[in-house]
Design a protein with these regions (language model features):
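Acidic catalytic motifs of isoprenoid enzymes
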Residues: 1-169
Length: 170
């Protein structure tokens, strides 16, 4: 995520995807996966969740913009909600609502990070705010990339903050 060669980063993620599969099939090589394997087995953590996290990381390599909330939601789910869902399994949740809460809290955390990091992400050529919402609030992408924040931008950010608040409250 921090300015690495995308080809190298993608290769590393592919390697970790394979290593994750190896962990679930009893043949991990890396010390981290060897240490994690018994935890995964003890808590019956689903293999698919680990793949979803890597899918989210790959989205960071392949995408710099998201068309709408649905697309951004998927990214937030993969990089944050899935971590909460895995944590709920480890903590031994007993109420099914815990999974919905973990899902929504992950979305809220990631959206909060996106709001916090708008300037930093823009300096790296990324805008995580949905394109359709930029258009709805009349905020050109160039304005964000140039670090120029208008009243329309403030309204857009208020909208995002309210969305995050609602996710925290669910």
């Amino acid at each position: 995520d921090e300015g690495h060669d995308p080809v190298v980063a993608r290769s590393k993620l592919d390697w970790w995807r394979g290593e994750g599969a190896a962990m679930f099939h009893g043949t991990p090589q890396h010390p981290v996966s060897r240490a994690l394997a018994p935890v995964v087995a003890d808590f019956a953590l689903p293999e698919s969740r680990f793949g979803e996290i890597i899918d989210g990381m790959q989205m960071d390599l392949l995408q710099t913009r998201y068309l709408d909330w649905k697309a951004l939601h998927l990214y937030c789910y993969r990089v944050a909600s899935v971590v909460g869902l895995l944590s709920a399994e480890i903590f031994g949740y007993t109420n099914r609502q815990t999974l919905k809460y973990a899902h929504d809290l992950g979305l809220a955390f990631q959206l909060t990070n996106i709001i916090r990091d708008v300037g930093e992400d823009a300096r790296r050529g990324r805008i995580y705010l949905p394109i359709d919402e930029l258009q709805r609030f009349n905020v050109p992408a160039r304005q964000i990339l140039d670090g120029q924040y208008s009243e329309d931008f403030r309204k857009l950010m208020s909208f995002q903050a309210e969305r995050a608040r609602q996710l925290y409250d669910q």
